[in-house]
């Protein structure tokens, strides 16, 4: 295939008022078999390797841990932390930044209530955080960092901040990627492929920027491989036999299941933070959790089966 004949164009672009963006792209003139190869590679890179920004910790005046209650605030700490995960941020710097909030009730707190440095922009300022139902004052300090994929709150880091409650952070700016491959005939009646890619982002990056950045990451990856000398020593080949398979669900946060508040809080209080943690529980063991009833269990079972094809045994 002559790469100079490849054609890529954006054939659809949409932006939702609350922030998310959607784009559809067409890559034409591909040889047979190349559509699915490029589609799979782009999808993995777009979902796993692009950099994003998220709140990674909070310090709340008068609060010691995530199981505390804040006087005069409708939500508990776990609900507030869950709401904070929905705030979409865009940063002009990779450095750690801090934001602050100080508000006296009664008041409804949204993302726009947070005071941020000029390098940080809130994409969805109307996103709900909490409600102060009395005249109490709520003070929160936010730790904001950049990264890729997601990071669990219970992962240990040497630079943890004292008095901060660490939060699960989703850095991924691309929320969803779909693609399909179609066969077409060129002018010489030869079968060619065209690749249609659909990209949804959280609004901190456009689909056009996402596919451009993802393509460059792939190019640089293969460029670095091509510049290295291949080591054919037998020791290196033997080492590959000792690589242990990784459970694909081990590090997926339970927030990805998008459970309702009650079962989510029960799981978090039981220190069930990932799908891997959840898979350690049988249905009977789950029902033994405090305040975890049959309705919550049925929701968890159904969500695991419908989203991941997993059935607890």
UniProtKB/Swiss-Prot annotation:
Main location per the UniProt record = plastid
Protein's UniProt keywords contain Calcium: no
Specify where the region named Alpha C-terminal domain (alpha-CTD) lies, as residue ranges: 243-313
Q: Where is this region: Alpha N-terminal domain (alpha-NTD)?
A: 1-229
Tell where it localizes: Plastid, Chloroplast
GO annotation terms (biological process):
DNA-templated transcription
Keyword terms, alphabetized? Chloroplast, DNA-directed RNA polymerase, Nucleotidyltransferase, Plastid, Transcription, Transferase
The free-text function statement in the UniProt record for this protein reads: DNA-dependent RNA polymerase catalyzes the transcription of DNA into RNA using the four ribonucleoside triphosphates as substrates.
Q: How does it assemble?
A: In plastids the minimal PEP RNA polymerase catalytic core is composed of four subunits: alpha, beta, beta', and beta''. When a (nuclear-encoded) sigma factor is associated with the core the holoenzyme is formed, which can initiate transcription.
Q: What is this protein called?
A: DNA-directed RNA polymerase subunit alpha
Q: What is the lineage of its organism?
A: Eukaryota, Sar, Stramenopiles, Ochrophyta, Bacillariophyta
């Amino acid at each position: 295939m002559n790469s100079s004949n490849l054609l890529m164009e954006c054939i659809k672009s949409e932006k939702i008022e609350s922030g998310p963006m959607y784009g559809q792209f067409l890559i034409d003139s591909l040889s047979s078999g190349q559509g699915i190869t490029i589609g799979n590679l782009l999808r993995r890179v777009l979902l796993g390797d692009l950099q994003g920004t998220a709140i990674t910790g909070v310090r709340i005046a008068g609060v010691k841990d995530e199981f505390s209650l804040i006087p005069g605030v409708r939500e508990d700490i776990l609900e507030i932390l869950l709401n904070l995960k929905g705030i979409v941020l865009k940063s002009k710097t990779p450095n750690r930044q801090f934001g602050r909030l100080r508000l006296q009730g009664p008041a409804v707190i949204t993302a726009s209530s947070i005071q941020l440095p000029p390098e940080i922009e809130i994409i969805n300022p109307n996103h709900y955080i909490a409600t102060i139902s009395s005249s109490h004052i709520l003070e929160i300090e936010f730790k904001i960092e950049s990264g890729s994929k997601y990071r669990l709150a219970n992962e240990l880091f040497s630079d943890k901040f004292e008095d901060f409650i660490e939060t699960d952070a989703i850095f991924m700016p691309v929320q969803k990627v779909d693609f399909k491959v179609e066969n077409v005939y060129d002018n010489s009646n030869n079968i060619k492929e065209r690749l249609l890619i659909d990209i949804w982002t959280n609004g901190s990056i456009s689909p056009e920027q996402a596919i451009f950045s993802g393509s460059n990451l792939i190019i640089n990856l293969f460029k670095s491989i091509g510049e290295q000398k291949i080591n054919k020593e037998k020791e290196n080949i033997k080492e590959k036999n000792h690589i242990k398979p990784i459970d694909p669900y081990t590090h997926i946060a339970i927030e990805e299941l998008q459970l309702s508040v009650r079962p989510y809080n029960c799981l978090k209080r039981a220190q069930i933070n990932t799908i891997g943690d959840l898979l350690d529980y049988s249905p009977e063991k789950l029902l033994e959790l405090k305040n975890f009833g049959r309705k919550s269990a049925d929701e968890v079972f159904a969500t695991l089966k419908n989203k991941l094809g997993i059935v607890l045994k």
